[in-house]
Amino acid sequence: SLGSRGLGDVYKRQVESESELKNIINLSKNKKTVVNVGIRLNPNVNAQTIGKISTGRMQDKFGLTFKDAIKIIDKYKNSNSIRFKCLSVHIGSQILSNVPYQKMIRVVNNFLEKVSVNFEYVDFGGGMGIDYSSNKKTFDFKKLALEIYKFSKRNECKIILEPGRSIIGDTAVLISKVIYIKESPTKDFIILDAGMNDLIRPALYNAKHMIIPAIKSSKKSKKEYDFVGPICETSDRFLKMKKFQKLNEGEIVILKDVGAYGYVLSSNYNVRPMPKEVLVDKSKTQIISKRQSIKDLI
């Protein structure tokens, strides 16, 4: 909480409501310090992504409306307790089209023309997506760079981008063993030793992570495979795949592109230990997180 941490130990405090700003001002007065504040603007832009990770629409909980942001800045710009340092926007995650960013930048340009303070920074957030499927659709960074270049020619401020997923999303995999194969008339359930506690994105967002066999074979399954985990939730499932190679119990499969929102969202749900993390650098390997034991949980 703000009250339990120093106000001067971070570059800026992000504000998304007047209530937050009042709290910061009161704490600042008590501690006799001046706080750098960032205002988050909700640009009302549809990011064309999964609804649960869209953050820049009017119905989303994030940021201030154009009108409210102007009003709050005008009301508190002369306060001796804060400095409006940064304007922030972030419209969502796993975005593959540049159109939402173009719309967002137009809104920001319009806002900067009307606001009564000069921001040192504009933070455009992140959200640039990666290709989780096999259709090779990738984000066009050149188009985004051109839009940001045009913005920089128009506005004298430093620009921040947060392209985390696009950098690390495809740098990690989840390795799992087939522990059981449950046959049914229409499909086979491939039950893995990895569960939704290890990778929750499919259960949480209906996200799809491609699955490949560790050892390839030319033998194909005649039925659809439904890759699931061992947890007592129907949502503990990863992916349905047709024409997958025939698998046997004990074989290893690989879930791809888990570098972003993978391990960081994992948990001990169902009394399951966290998996081991191994860093691979060419031919070298290093354990960076040990696998938990049941004793660790207790």
Model-inferred region functions:
Residues 5, 39, 87, 124, ...:
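Conserved, mostly hydrophobic/aromatic
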Residues 5, 33, 82, 117, ...:
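Structured loop/turn residues at beta-strand edges in well-structured enzyme cores
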Residues 12-19:
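Catalytic beta/alpha-barrel core
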Residues 34-46:
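Glycine-rich, aromatic-flanked loop segments that form ligand/cofactor-binding clefts
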Residues 43-181:
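Active-site loop/helix belt of alpha/beta enzymes
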